[in-house]
């Protein structure tokens, strides 16, 4: 009898052990839908979140904002700062099984620099050429010294894609992207979901514990949270500050936040097509008046529960790059009215487009009320975020509210938005003196010299005001208690390597 019991137990155990282990699937609620899934062409913040899982970069950014190895294991600058040599990780495969090597890096960088649709051109404008110095070594030769290049390569400009897929798909690469990250593309249904699955040949696969990840765009923060609370989602990004207390009080959920390195802003159409031909786009005094009509501290308290900070520059007030000679202005409606009178207007109608998420809409409703006192009649146009960015690009807007998630080097918060040929200069503002200052800041290895250049540029921009900076918010996440290993980073990314979903 004992022998029979042992045999039965052994057979039962064998049958159980033969059953497949339940796949760990992670469902993440995003505030917006990503735009095109091509690192060369895209510009959305949520797109970068998806790329963090799908497309490894030459280098990454640590939570303390240091540049760290990823596809490149080491790098060195020439003494004159005119060449950057990078050694690549051995044995890395793209999702299509082809090798990630020096030739692939060269092909990707050249694609970023030459593809007509590429938004990476201004980020790589200092690069004269990139060459393979061996199977796993590349050399970037520069036109002039550029201390920002490493930071650029820690983002979309440094995401290496399969040359075979890029050549086959061309500008349609985003329909079936092939990269070298921990997860590979499965499917996308716009405005519904993006699905990725674990790449079994990933170079760091032993630290990937999730088998499948689904990103679901849910613009309404209340609905996002409700889906998390019901268990339909495992994690959400950009939790509304008003919901922070509810998450902290829920024993089944985990809360995480960190102050970001980006900004919230209004972009004025200065010279981007026919819609720039209006008083607000043509007269800086009206833009200055609009800015003075806004109480940034009140915005922080009303909309962000005190978790944000007011701002008037691309760098937050606690940043070493902030120009202290231009403090965040207090609200001054009378001065705003004076500027409007000086410009010859009592009232000015403005159409302001805003993404269709509750926090952004609430913020713009408060702004709408504030600026009305000075004489601005604002009508709000709500639209899906990717559509909003497309309208900005095409110049089909008058004033547009958008965020920038920030970059580890100050250049990333200003150059591409403001320079005459900037890759995402939707305002089409162009001032050769600003270009000169920002290009010189890129070329200097002396932070004190760079600070002087940024300060001088900020004085001009604070007067011309093509972008009206509103402030700097915190990134806030919420997740199920069984999701562990998440590290909050000031860049707002959700890095899935090392993250686990416990049974």
Q: What kind of region is each of these model predictions?
A:
Residues 27, 101-108, 135-141, 181-182, ...:
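Alpha-helical secondary-structure segments
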Residues 29-79, 110, 175-179, 478, ...:
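N-terminal lobe/hinge region of extracytoplasmic solute-binding protein
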Residues 66, 154-208, 212, 333-334, ...:
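Gly/Pro-rich hinge or "lid" segments in bacterial periplasmic/extracellular proteins
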Residues 73-118, 133, 139, 224-227, ...:
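Aromatic- and charge-enriched surface segment that lines or borders ligand/interaction sites
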Residues 76, 87, 121-164:
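Surface-exposed binding/hinge segments that line
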Residues 189, 198, 256-264, 293-321, ...:
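Detector for C-terminal structural segments
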Residues 201-246, 368-369, 377-379:
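Ligand-site clamp/hinge motif
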Residues 275, 309-342, 359:
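Structural transition elements
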């Amino acid at each position: 009898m004992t022998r029979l019991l042992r045999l039965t137990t052994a057979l039962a155990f064998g049958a159980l052990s033969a059953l497949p282990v339940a796949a760990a699937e992670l469902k993440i609620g995003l505030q917006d839908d990503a735009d095109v899934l091509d690192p060369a062409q895209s510009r959305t913040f949520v797109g970068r979140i998806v790329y963090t899982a799908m497309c490894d970069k030459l280098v990454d950014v640590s939570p303390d904002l240091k540049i760290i190895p990823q596809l490149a294991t080491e790098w060195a600058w020439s003494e004159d700062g005119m060449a950057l040599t990078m050694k690549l990780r051995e044995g890395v495969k793209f999702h299509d099984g082809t090798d990630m090597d020096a030739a692939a890096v060269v092909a990707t960088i050249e694609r970023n620099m030459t593809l007509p649709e590429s938004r990476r051109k201004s980020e790589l404008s200092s690069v004269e050429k990139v060459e393979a110095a061996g199977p796993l070594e590349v050399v970037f030769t520069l036109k002039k010294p550029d201390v920002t290049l490493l930071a650029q390569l820690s983002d979309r400009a440094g995401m290496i894609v399969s040359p075979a897929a890029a050549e086959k798909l061309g500008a349609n690469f985003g329909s079936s992207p092939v990269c070298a990250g921990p997860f590979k593309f499965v499917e996308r249904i716009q405005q519904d979901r993006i699905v990725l699955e674990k790449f079994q040949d990933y170079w760091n696969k032993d630290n990937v514990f999730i088998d499948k990840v689904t990103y679901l765009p849910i613009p309404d923060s209340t609905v996002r949270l409700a889906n998390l609370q019901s268990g339909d989602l495992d994690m959400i990004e950009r939790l509304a500050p008003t919901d922070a207390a509810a998450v902290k009080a829920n024993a089944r959920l985990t809360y995480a936040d960190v102050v970001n390195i980006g900004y919230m802003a209004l972009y004025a159409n200065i010279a981007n097509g026919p819609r720039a031909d209006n008083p607000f786009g043509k007269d800086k005094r009206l833009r200055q008046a609009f800015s003075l009509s806004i109480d940034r501290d009140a915005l922080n308290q009303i909309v962000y529960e005190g978790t944000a900070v007011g701002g008037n520059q691309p760098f937050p007030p606690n940043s070493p790059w902030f120009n202290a000679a231009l403090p965040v202005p207090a609200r001054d409606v009378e001065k705003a009215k004076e500027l409007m009178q000086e410009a010859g207007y009592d009232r000015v109608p403005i159409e302001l487009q805003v993404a269709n998420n509750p926090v952004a809409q609430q913020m713009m409703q408060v702004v709408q009320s504030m600026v009305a006192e000075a004489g601005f009649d604002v009508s709000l146009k709500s639209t899906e975020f990717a559509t909003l960015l497309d309208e900005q690009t095409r110049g089909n807007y008058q004033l547009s509210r958008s965020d920038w998630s920030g970059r580890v080097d100050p250049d990333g918060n200003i150059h591409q938005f403001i320079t005459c040929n900037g890759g995402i200069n939707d305002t089409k503002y162009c001032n050769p003196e600003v270009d000169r200052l920002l290009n010189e800041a890129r070329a200097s290895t002396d932070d004190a010299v760079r600070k002087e250049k940024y300060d001088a540029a900020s004085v001009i921009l604070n007067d011309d005001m093509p972008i009206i900076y509103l402030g700097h918010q915190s990134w806030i996440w919420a997740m199920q208690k069984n999701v562990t290993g998440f590290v909050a980073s000031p860049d707002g990314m959700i890095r899935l390597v090392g993250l686990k979903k416990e049974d």
